[in-house]
A protein has these predicted regions:
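Cross-family detector of peptidyl-prolyl cis-trans isomerase
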Residues: 1-254
Length: 254
């Protein structure tokens, strides 16, 4: 319908899209589906985490594109449909999709980076965009520490808002005194940014606290004592009581 001229969306990239949807061939076609009237959605391109029709349609399309997508049941809600939206297992769904923004898989924030306080880990960004974290040869802070290293200029992140992050995390105790900590978690290693709901309780408590109130475009250092990280029951490979050091790049919000 309209050709865009922005960044093209490739596998591993994140696309922020805005769409409306209607059911083909029924009275429902006179009005958009409930809760799908010009709603923003964040899609990890090629990730298989959204409707197949949208995933396929967005790939290789540039930001600024508006497209018409006709999705038969197999590419929309499948044989079971979606009762909440009023879509049956035999319904074809028509989408009008606007690609608002494309965030490359290895994007980072831009801006002058400040040095963290001497008592906190220091951060460098390598050529891949991943954070190189240098942990002091000292005991970790007992309380949550959040320090903004790069000032973003975008919207302020609100509780409940979906945001797109690059992240790198290390365990303080495992890396104490090391110039470059081993990362146990990294979106750059995963090959795609992470989408989270700020303050939604689905990530570390420290991240939830650190994200809300920051501006999009910020880089934030988070040092999380165990009570704000994994506590006494961490995942495999992380010691109980671990202090987690994370570097978060807030790339976008929807």
């Amino acid at each position: 319908m309209t050709a865009g001229h922005g960044q093209a969306a490739h596998t591993g990239d994140v696309a922020i899209v805005r769409y409306t949807a209607q059911v083909w061939g029924s009275r429902k076609a006179q009005a958009p589906l409930p809760e799908m009237d010009a709603q923003n959605q964040i899609i990890t391109v090629g990730g298989g985490l959204t409707l197949p029709a949208l995933d396929r349609a967005v790939e290789n399309q540039p930001a600024g594109t508006r497209m018409l997508v006709v999705a038969p049941p197999a590419a929309a809600y499948g044989e079971t449909g979606n009762k909440r939206l009023g879509v049956s297992g035999t319904d074809t769904v028509v989408f009008v999709v606007d690609i608002m923004q494309v965030i490359p898989a290895h994007a980072t924030v831009h801006g002058e980076q400040r040095q963290a306080a001497d008592s906190l880990p220091q951060v460098r960004i390598d050529r891949s965009g991943a954070a190189a974290i240098s942990v002091p040869d000292a005991d970790a802070p007992r309380e949550l520490a959040v320090e903004r290293l790069v000032d973003g200029t975008g919207q302020v992140v609100k509780a409940g808002q979906t945001v797109v992050l690059q992240h790198s995390s290390a365990v303080w105790q495992n890396a104490q005194g090391e110039d470059r900590a081993d990362l146990f978690m990294s979106s750059h290693a995963d090959g795609r940014p992470l989408t989270v709901v700020a303050g939604g309780g689905n990530v570390l408590k420290a991240w939830d606290r650190a994200l809300v109130g920051q501006r999009v475009g910020s880089r934030v250092l988070v040092v999380a004592p165990a009570k704000f990280a994994y506590g006494a029951h961490p995942p495999k490979g992380i010691p109980a009581g671990a202090v987690v050091v994370s570097v978060l790049d807030i790339l976008a919000g929807a």
